[in-house]
Structure formats: structure tokens, C-alpha cells
């Protein structure tokens, strides 16, 4: 089950990353596909390795907000752990079939399909840290590393700046120019 979940998420992530890339960034289909597969696996496994010299802080990548959102999702899914993912999948299946579609089981047994306490604590903590980190990154870096981004790009880059240091270590901003408050927030 773990292998199926891992490969499914990584393959979907690789396809989405590949589709988010511009054709001019790589010399040929296979180089682009290798980049997509490598970064999907690296993000889901929370490794943070990149094949690019400056990480994702390269001209063709630091403004690719779709790529950043895909990597954020992979980072979060990989960081949650398999028991949480399985619990979420079971709950989602139950909620979709019973609550939304109204499908009733022919079996007359009661099974409480709820998110476990572990799942709830993990999800609440993960998204709370992500939200607080995004807001603080956005505020402290608005007139610094986020200056070159506009509109929704500032928010996505702040979200990426909050999600990545907790688990993987990808970067889409120049880490050497971060303000002191951002560095302190990132450390803790």
C-alpha cells in the first residue's frame, strides 16, 4: 500500500510539474521529464535536492507559481506520513460516497469513519504552521525578497517560503538576502 501511494503521488506530481514547465527551459523532452520526475520525488520525499545550480531561484523557475504550488502540495503530502494519508483517503472515500453521492452500503454494520485524533492534530498543526509562516514571511519579506514578485506571486512565494524550510529546503528567493526576522522564524 505504501509503495502504491508513493508512486501514485510522485507520478501525478511529475506529470503536473512537466505540464507547468515552458518548452524553452530544457533541451528536449527527456531533460524536461527528468527534471519533473526528479523534483517530484525530491519534494515528496522532503529531500529538497534540485538539479539546478541555484535551486529553484533560477530565472525560468522562480516566477513559475504553478510549479511552486505543485511542490508545496508534494512537500505537505510527503511530510504528513502514510498513516495520516491513509486515514485521509479512507475518510474522503467515505465522505464522497455516503455524504455527497448518498450511496448506502448493503451491509448493516456501523463503522465510524472519522479522522483519527492523530490525523486531526497533525493536520491542524501543519496548516496552522503553514498559515502563520506564510503571513510572517509575507510581512517580513514584502519589501525585500518579494519585491520582484507581483500580485498573487508574492503570496505563492511566501507560501513556498513557509512550506519548504520546514521539510525540504527548496528555495525560490535569494536566501542570503532574507531579513533577520525571517531567518529567525525559519530557524524555529
What would you call each of these model-derived segments?
Residues 1-188:
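Membrane-proximal intracellular helices of multi-pass ion channels
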Amino acid at each position: 500500500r505504501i509503495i502504491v501511494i508513493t508512486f501514485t503521488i510522485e507520478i501525478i506530481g511529475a506529470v503536473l510539474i512537466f505540464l507547468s514547465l515552458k518548452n524553452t527551459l530544457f533541451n528536449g523532452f527527456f531533460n524536461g521529464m527528468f527534471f519533473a520526475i526528479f523534483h517530484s520525488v525530491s519534494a515528496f520525499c522532503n529531500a529538497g535536492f534540485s538539479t539546478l545550480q541555484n535551486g529553484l531561484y533560477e530565472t525560468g523557475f522562480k516566477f513559475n507559481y504553478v510549479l511552486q504550488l505543485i511542490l508545496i502540495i508534494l512537500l505537505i503530502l510527503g511530510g504528513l506520513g502514510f498513516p495520516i494519508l491513509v486515514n485521509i483517503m479512507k475518510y474522503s472515500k467515505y465522505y464522497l460516497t455516503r455524504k455527497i453521492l448518498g450511496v448506502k452500503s448493503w451491509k448493516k454494520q456501523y463503522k465510524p469513519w472519522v479522522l483519527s485524533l492523530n490525523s486531526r492534530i497533525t493536520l491542524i498543526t501543519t496548516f496552522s504552521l503553514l498559515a502563520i509562516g506564510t503571513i510572517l514571511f509575507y510581512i517580513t519579506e514584502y519589501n525585500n525578497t518579494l519585491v520582484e514578485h507581483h500580485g498573487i506571486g508574492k503570496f505563492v512565494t511566501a507560501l513556498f517560503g513557509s512550506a519548504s524550510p520546514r521539510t525540504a529546503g527548496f528555495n525560490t528567493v535569494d536566501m542570503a538576502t532574507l531579513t533577520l526576522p525571517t531567518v529567525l522564524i525559519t530557524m524555529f
